[in-house]
């Protein structure tokens, strides 16, 4: 989209390189390859593997893991199938910036040798990680190759997931870049529209059942809403983080189903209870469809998405009533904080001089915010105090996730800055509040927009520690109002 995407979606209007870099280790294997050729490994049961060849290798993630644990699927078969789909898709939609083709196959072989295979929650599940999140041995965007895995990657591997590579993300994950050899990621539902992020596009296109995403001002939820997948941003410190951006973004999950997202989040948070998504007890739910400012207009189909979610919740037995969220100046405060944190963290980068001129200009603005103390903790304290009072009456609040359909898939950042900033404010005014206070929020698909031919969605948000409640309510929505797992 534009520089604006940094404001509303932590750079979610993503761009990718013209061709993903494929890394190849020295080791060779006779296990399944990305060409689709496979050799049955010792100890496999060929007849059972054939029984599983009916699409189980494409997900959902929980099905893949169960089949791998039970010996119905070889994880190499799953990785090979995913690699084939990615290779075909990246000929026209460059979603992956780094595809770890041979490494993924080698890791799949190693997975079969693990003594704990039968208890791994994500055994053999292919996953994508957002660019900028270190994978050991892979180049960092702004410095040398990473020497260790980010905690997110380490936990995914420990749970048996196979990390296929990095999906593309803008510089510093902060804004759209679509110049030169880069191009905007297109929406799998309507290629004329933006996808919101490469991670969401990868999930919606069926390349992977689960992807990691970073959410600084709504990126995971904005992109999930654009692409019709489920996305959740956990509360602050639920998932560990390290490095320059620790504290300014949360590591979230995008998936084709709530079950899969809950499974992945339970792994990232080291909380097995989050994978349990039985219906919640009777909840008090507020429906808040008004935008943070009367100057902002909300597309009626996005308002209808929130109202539909509220109706489904009421039919499920929850107490639902109209409500007014106490936004105050939260969106503006979130923007100022985002600028200040970005400028604060840049010196920690290994090679900050590699940043683009445009990024350096924006970081200079962040330093000005710091210098004049325009972003300070008291702003957050005031907003949080009002929200705590609001949530004395409610367990969950429902809003539209976005206020408009995804923007057109073009190089928005070439447009003049006021135009892009205005577009950003119009797109996603509902998401930044929850980043400012560090509370959990999720985006739940709720149908299609009749004019843009892209999905619409509702946002569910709750107080600190309500991740399980949001997941359970979202799963209940999915059961009563199911959505198509991937784009046609």
Region spans (language model):
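Intrinsically disordered, low-complexity segments enriched in small polar residues
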Residues: 2, 11-14, 36
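Residue-level recognition of beta-strand->loop/alpha-helix junctions
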Residues: 167-168, 324, 445
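Residue-level detector of structural "landmarks"
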Residues: 6, 15-17
């Amino acid at each position: 989209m534009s520089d604006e995407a940094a404001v509303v979606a932590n750079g979610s209007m993503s761009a990718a390189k013209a061709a993903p870099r494929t890394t190849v280790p020295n080791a060779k294997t006779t296990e399944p390859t990305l060409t689709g050729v496979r050799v049955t490994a010792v100890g496999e049961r060929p007849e059972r593997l054939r029984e599983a060849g009916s699409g189980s290798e494409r997900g959902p993630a929980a099905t893949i893991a169960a089949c791998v644990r039970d010996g119905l699927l070889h994880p190499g078969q799953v990785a090979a199938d995913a690699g084939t789909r990615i290779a075909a898709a990246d000929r026209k939609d460059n979603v992956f910036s780094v595809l770890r083709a041979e490494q993924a196959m080698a890791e799949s072989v190693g997975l079969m040798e693990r003594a704990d295979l039968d208890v791994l929650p994500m055994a053999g599940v292919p996953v994508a990680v957002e660019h900028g999140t270190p994978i050991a041995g892979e180049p960092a965007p702004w410095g040398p190759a990473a020497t260790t895995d980010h905690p997110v990657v380490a936990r995914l591997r420990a749970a048996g997931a196979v990390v296929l590579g990095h999906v593309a993300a803008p510089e510093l994950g902060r804004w759209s870049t679509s110049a030169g050899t880069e191009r905007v990621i297109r929406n799998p539902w309507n290629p004329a529209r933006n996808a919101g992020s490469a991670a969401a596009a990868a999930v919606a296109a069926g390349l992977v059942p689960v992807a990691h995403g970073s959410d600084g001002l709504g990126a995971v939820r904005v992109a999930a809403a654009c692409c019709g997948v489920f996305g959740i941003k956990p509360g602050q410190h639920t998932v560990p983080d390290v490095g320059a951006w620790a504290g300014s973004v949360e590591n979230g999950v995008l998936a084709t189903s709530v079950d899969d997202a809950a499974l992945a989040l339970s792994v990232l948070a080291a909380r097995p209870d989050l994978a349990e998504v039985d219906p919640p007890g009777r909840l008090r739910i507020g429906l808040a469809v008004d935008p943070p400012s009367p100057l902002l207009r909300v597309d009626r189909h996005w308002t209808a998405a929130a109202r539909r979610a509220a109706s489904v919740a009421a039919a499920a037995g929850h107490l639902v009533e109209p409500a007014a969220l106490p936004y105050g100046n939260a969106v503006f405060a979130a923007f100022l904080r985002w600028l200040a944190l970005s400028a604060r963290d840049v010196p920690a980068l290994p090679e900050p001089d590699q940043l683009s001129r445009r990024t350096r200009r924006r970081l200079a603005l962040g330093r000005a915010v710091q210098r004049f103390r325009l972003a300070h903790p008291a702003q957050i304290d005031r907003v949080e105090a009002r929200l705590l009072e609001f949530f004395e009456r409610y367990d969950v609040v429902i809003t539209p996730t976005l206020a408009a359909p995804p923007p057109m898939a073009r190089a928005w950042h070439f447009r003049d800055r006021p135009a892009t900033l205005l577009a950003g404010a119009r797109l996603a005014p509902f998401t930044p509040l929850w980043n400012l206070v560090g509370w959990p929020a999720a985006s739940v698909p709720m149908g299609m927009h009749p004019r843009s031919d892209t999905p619409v969605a509702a946002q569910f948000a709750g107080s600190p520690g309500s991740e399980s409640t949001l997941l359970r309510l979202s799963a209940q929505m999915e059961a009563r109002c199911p959505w198509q797992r991937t784009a046609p």
